[in-house]
Amino acid sequence: MEMKQISETTLKITISMEDLEDRGMELKDFLIPQEKTEEFFYSVMDELDLPENFKNSGMLSFRVTPKKDRIDVFVTKSELSKDLNLEELADLGDISKMSPEDFFKTLEQSMLEKGDTDAHAKLAEIENMMDKATQEVVEENVSEEQPEKEVETIGYVHYVFDFDNIEAVVRFSQTIDFPIEASELYKNGKGYHMTILLDLENQPSYFANLMYARMLEHANVGTKTRAYLKEHSIQLIHDDAISKLQMIEMG
């Protein structure tokens, strides 16, 4: 297994078919997301010595490109939480009812009205972030000597969120009204942490950023990686944490 940083925001991880077989994985496992796919991504990230600027990212997206003798996993980190004041999202109204286009237009207009030209410029970068990451994948593949048959790229996104108490975790879970591929709940000291995996298949390029912004209305940006949580925290719910917490009624 090899890792190469191809840009400030994107890593390329190459995994041979032999490595896949050793992990009990097959190419078909990536076509239909399941628990073993989730664990595969997490285990790969746990084993690698990630660059410092990737270790504290609250959002990582995964895109898998199968090849004849290997798979290439492209990992892209988002800077959304560092460049936008997400507390101001409350001023935009109920963004859960907005289309992606309306969300970005409303956010852009809000920034312009407040004279936040720097954030406005950054928004344009964020809106194109996933498209640029895809282009990096294409350029990397084109640069290889042996042309290979074009295959569909499979994408996932991984989040980590922080919460001050269990009540906040339950409230967050009850706001989720879209499919979650996998979720876990951890306790570390006095705080709680949740990991979430989403499938990006058949979604627009800005879907990951939109979902991240929606969830940050009810959660804090993650300050720990899943690898850290698994080693230093108590895992309260191992899988399907969101749906299990949604069953709790709060007075």
Curated annotation (Swiss-Prot):
Oligomer and partners: Homodimer.
Signal peptide from the UniProt entry: none
UniProt xrefs under InterPro entries: MecA_C_sf (IPR038471), Neg-reg_MecA (IPR008681)
Record GO terms (molecular function): protein-macromolecule adaptor activity
Gene coding for it: mecA
HAMAP family: MecA
Protein family membership: Belongs to the MecA family.
Protein name as catalogued: Adapter protein MecA
Function summary: Enables the recognition and targeting of unfolded and aggregated proteins to the ClpC protease or to other proteins involved in proteolysis.
Domain notes per entry: The N-terminal domain probably binds unfolded/aggregated proteins; the C-terminal domain interacts with ClpC.
Organism of this sequence: Streptococcus agalactiae serotype V (strain ATCC BAA-611 / 2603 V/R)
